[in-house]
Amino acid sequence: MINLRKTHPLLKIINHAFIDLPTPSNISAWWNFGSLLGMCLMIQILTGLFLAMHYTSDTMTAFSSVAHICRDVNYGWLLRNLHANGASMFFMCLFLHVGRGIYYGSYLYKETWNIGVILLLTVMATAFVGYVLPWGQMSFWGATVITNLLSAIPYIGSTLAEWIWGGFAVDKATLTRFFAFHFILPFIITALAMVHLLFLHETGSNNPTGINPNADKIPFHPYYTIKDALGLTFLFLVLLLLALFSPDMLGDPDNFSPANPLNTPPHIKPEWYFLFAYAILRSIPNKLGGVLALLASIMILLILPLLHTANQRSMMFRPISQTLFWILTADLITLTWIGGQPVEQPFIIIGQLASMLYLLLILVLMPLAGLLENYMMKPKW
């Protein structure tokens, strides 16, 4: 009898993607994050769906509807804690996934990489509109500050900001449309993730050495299904520890107060996963300049394939590039810390230096290191 998974029109697609897929035999745990991100997305969609059944997107009742979910709905507190901390896990996996791509030169699969950057931007947009929904102080002021950045665009800025708000300030219309965006975007993310996977399977996975792995491939199942299962176990463990023992550790205390347009919080700051970009935005004392730097901090990922000068794909055998990569990692952690600090010295100057270093590393130092390593690896006889 012919195997059904190889002939059935639907099962055939699943088979080619997750069962009989030829996979390099040497991919490390750094290749687990794709499946972890898929699982994060599923958790977020499921918990979000059940939360949406009880949430009301109206300025008068949004805050109390979230309180009602936590107090009166069966396991509502758990759903909310899993959803809020699930977002943090999602971004943790995203950053590690992107970092892996930079370290091992995965960005040379241009289509896969570009779709990945679009995915990153879409997830960031989803998280931003989602953070506004509980209608706490930080939700309201975060929405006000970030949407206000649109007004920095020359000529059409003010009109654009008011169009997004649906009025002259962040209000009921804004909350309603943000809820609509937050509901639809995860399904767009799912579709994009499928396209991401489609492009990846056109070329096959990269591997730590960066050389062509065709000579030594193994089937995805059972080898990598079991490996992914182990990764998922760790993900669930960390998520449950967060959600059950310290659910508010990564949140902002200001968000326990209902939104009040007449009272500005002393320090307006977004969730931890946006702090690096927020620090870059704040480090430029000009509004439009800050917005452009904010965009550049993410969009710079799109030009990484053009900045690749090394003869080798991976950084595995390139110690100078490795050193610069880890300096970049430390720099991003520094920016994340600065983004959460008040706008005063010495934080201002540290933020400006870290922002400069971020752009300098990616645009100048890493391409130069690639050229230097090419020269050093040339035979000298």
From Swiss-Prot:
InterPro entries reported in the protein's UniProt record: Cyt_b/b6_C, Cyt_b/b6_C_sf, Cyt_b/b6_N, Cytb/b6-like_sf, Cytochrome_b, Cytochrome_b_C_euk/bac, Cytochrome_b_N_euk/bac, Di-haem_cyt_TM
Cofactor note: Binds 2 heme b groups non-covalently.
Sequence similarity: Belongs to the cytochrome b family.
Chief location bin: mitochondrion
Binding, heme b b562: 83, 182
Subcellular location: Mitochondrion inner membrane
Cofactor: heme b
Entries under SUPFAM superfamilies matching the protein: a domain/subunit of cytochrome bc1 complex (Ubiquinol-cytochrome c reductase) (SSF81648), Transmembrane di-heme cytochromes (SSF81342)
Subunit structure: The cytochrome bc1 complex contains 11 subunits: 3 respiratory subunits (MT-CYB, CYC1 and UQCRFS1), 2 core proteins (UQCRC1 and UQCRC2) and 6 low-molecular weight proteins (UQCRH/QCR6, UQCRB/QCR7, UQCRQ/QCR8, UQCR10/QCR9, UQCR11/QCR10 and a cleavage product of UQCRFS1). This cytochrome bc1 complex then forms a dimer.
Keywords annotated in UniProt: Electron transport, Heme, Iron, Membrane, Metal-binding, Mitochondrion, Mitochondrion inner membrane, Respiratory chain, Transmembrane, Transmembrane helix, Transport, Ubiquinone
Segments traversing the membrane: 33-53, 77-98, 113-133, 178-198, 226-246, 288-308, 320-340, 347-367
Topological relation to the membrane, as annotated: Multi-pass membrane protein
Protein name: Cytochrome b
GO BP terms: mitochondrial electron transport, ubiquinol to cytochrome c
One example GO MF annotation: metal ion binding
Annotated heme b b566 binding sites: 97, 196
Residues where a ubiquinone binds: 201
Note in the entry: Heme 1 (or BL or b562) is low-potential and absorbs at about 562 nm, and heme 2 (or BH or b566) is high-potential and absorbs at about 566 nm.
Role summary: Component of the ubiquinol-cytochrome c reductase complex (complex III or cytochrome b-c1 complex) that is part of the mitochondrial respiratory chain. The b-c1 complex mediates electron transfer from ubiquinol to cytochrome c. Contributes to the generation of a proton gradient across the mitochondrial membrane that is then used for ATP synthesis.
Any single Gene Ontology cellular-component annotation: mitochondrial inner membrane
